[in-house]
Design a protein with these regions (language model features):
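C-terminal-of-GTPase-core extension/linker across diverse P-loop GTPases
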Residues: 2-6, 11, 17, 145, ...
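Generic secondary-structure boundary/loop-capping signal
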Residues: 24-32, 39-41, 49, 63, ...
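Flexible beta-alpha connector loops of hexameric P-loop NTPases
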Residues: 74-80, 118-123, 130-136, 155-160, ...
Length: 371
């Protein structure tokens, strides 16, 4: 899974990326300090995997991972190439989802950049969101208009392309009204047509409302946050309250107990990274299954609804091709039996599942195959 972190200059985007990945991306009070996208691979925290590793003492413990990409800040006019627009838009296209960092704090020492590097205006999270949304929409409109032309031309030789042309014409009108592809209403078949265009404004989005340290524990009182939350609710998007500076402080604490105490003192249950990862999984409809043994304990990420052979294919294509069965027990069932697979087997909880089995979150699986 690859998440692109985007935002206008000076909203705290690179500070958040630094905290998440400890990659040390340059962060400064001027636009475009991130010119090439910085990439960081982050392990997905999973207490179930930790427990299995404690039980089996494997040679290797391998968590699931998320790739975060810190994409250069953009300004108004990016879809026409302003600022670092074209590079920015192409980098977004390579991601699975967008984390849009939105400034929800006041600080007179950090200028709020909108139209160009010299302009400093009052903080306006909804205006910032609109600026980036419009750039994505305008880039998509250009792409969709090309698809209309292509489908219309193809329909002269094959009438099946007529419907495709009509779908893209309707989508073009939707985009031209300033609305994102995410909000385009259509049925499942037409959605499949739309998805072939690889549109930027169709990508799932999380608004990361970046607030100051003061009062973060009571983020609901932040008027900027509330405005972003209400917008996300109307769009059906996700919103995540976060404080990038606090996340940076947390990232510098190596001791897990020290981190827990730091969070408790702030009245925060989970770090922003943990909440962002969970939010990302929910947004993209992802779950994890586990493989276990003396050689390796590992977490694997799959889409909800994935059947056993396709889950096996995540490990190796030969296992999917030669799939026989999946010996399965859910982690919670195993723990209810005293943390013993043998005890769970005695109780008949270790199941032999076939090709139609839909893998569940937390399933511990041993795949039988023959090639």
């Amino acid at each position: 899974m690859k998440l692109g972190i985007v935002g206008l200059p000076n909203v705290g985007k690179s500070t958040l990326f630094n905290a998440i990945t400890n990659a040390g991306a340059e962060s400064a009070n001027y636009p475009f300090c991130t010119i090439e996208p910085n990439v960081g691979v982050v392990a997905v925290p999973d207490a179930r995997l930790d427990k299995l590793a404690e039980m089996y003492q494997p040679d290797k413990k391998t968590p699931a991972v998320i790739e975060f990409v810190d994409i250069a800040g953009l300004v108004k006019g990016a879809s026409q190439g302003a600022g670092l627009g074209n590079k920015f838009l192409e980098n977004i296209r390579r991601t699975d989802a967008i984390v849009h960092v939105v400034r929800c704090f006041d600080d007179e020492n950090i200028m709020h950049v909108v139209a160009d590097a010299s302009q400093n205006v009052p903080v306006d999270p909804l205006g910032d969101i609109e600026t980036i949304d419009l750039e994505l929409i305008m880039a998509d409109l250009e792409m969709v208009n090309r698809r209309v032309e292509k489908a219309t031309k193809a329909a002269k030789g094959d009438k099946k392309f007529l419907h495709e042309a009509e779908v893209f014409k309707a989508l073009a009108a939707h985009l031209d009204s300033g609305k994102s592809a995410r909000t385009f209403a259509c049925d499942k078949d037409d959605r499949a047509i739309v998805e072939t265009a690889d549109l930027l404004s169709l990508k799932p989005i999380i608004y990361a409302a970046n607030m100051g340290e003061d009062g973060f524990a009571h983020y609901e009182d932040n008027a900027y946050f509330r405005s972003v939350r209400d917008l996300a609710a109307r769009e059906g998007a996700q919103v995540l309250p976060i404080c990038a500076k606090l996340e940076q402080d947390i990232a510098e604490l190596d001791d897990p107990e020290e981190r827990a105490m730091f969070l408790a003192d702030l009245g925060i249950e989970k770090s922003g990274l943990d909440r962002l990862i969970q939010c990302s999984y929910d947004l993209l409809g992802l779950i994890s299954f586990l493989t276990y043994g003396k050689d390796e304990c590992r977490a694997w990420t799959i889409k909800k609804g994935t059947k056993a052979p396709q889950a096996a294919g995540k490990i190796h294509s030969d296992i999917e091709r030669g799939f026989i069965r999946a010996e399965t027990i859910n982690f919670d069932e195993m723990m209810a039996c005293g943390g013993s697979v043998a005890a769970a087997k005695e109780k008949g909880l270790l199941r032999s599942e076939g090709k139609e089995y839909v893998v569940k979150d937390g399933d511990m699986i041993y795949f039988r195959f023959n090639v």
